[in-house]
Amino acid sequence: MDSAAPSPLQRIDQDLFDAVAAAAAGSPRRRRNHNFHAPSDRVQRFLNVLQPGTYVRPHRHRRAQPGDGFECFLVLQGAVGLLLLDAKGRVLQRERISAAGPLRGIELAEGVIHTLVALSPDAVMMEIKQGPYEPAADKDFLPGFPLEGSEAAAAQEAAWRALFGPGDDHLSPAHPLP
């Protein structure tokens, strides 16, 4: 599921959502990507399916190549919480992004430290960002946060998920982003 399909037309339908969600549920990481791009493509396009309990270590993207290193998230099924953090790991802003709205997607500028939490089972996001994909340089992780798979990571994910109460569709920042 992680490689691009050779077909000139790639369907984005419920069958695909269900297949990738099942793979995510069976994964120790509790998430799975389905790429529509080749690693060398100038634009990365993929589904990112998250299950509750997945831990996304806080990170930012910095590009070595010229261009705008944006990241665009559009939730197609379920709900996801986005947290923007400062350099010390403090939450600056929380956003509930949901296929049921009112906020269904965001575009995030390069260099912004962030993490995601699954707020529903089988949460499906379409992500678009500038390529090519360079695994060694894709993410700059924020120091001081636990590694994936640890008990501390599970506790951190639960604490972040608790920041999103039921029905909190948009929570304003405590203070503006730098």
Task: Walk through the language-model features, giving the residues of each.
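His/acidic/aromatic-lined binding-pocket segments of jelly-roll/cupin-type domains
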Residues: 46-48, 65-66, 70-75, 106, ...
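Short acidic-glycine-tyrosine-enriched beta hairpin
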Residues: 86-114
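Short solvent-exposed loop/turn micro-motifs enriched in small/polar/acidic residues
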Residues: 40-41, 65-67, 99, 108-110
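Short beta-strand His + acidic residue motifs that chelate non-heme Fe in jelly-roll/DSBH
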Residues: 58, 82-84, 106-108, 114-119, ...
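Double-stranded beta-helix
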Residues: 90, 115-178
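Glycine- and acidic-residue-biased ligand/ion/polar-headgroup-sensing regions
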Residues: 51, 69-87
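A short, N-terminal "cap"/entry segment at the start of jelly-roll beta-barrel domains
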Residues: 1-47, 95-98, 159-178
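Conserved short histidine dyad/triad with adjacent acidic residue
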Residues: 29-30, 48-67, 99
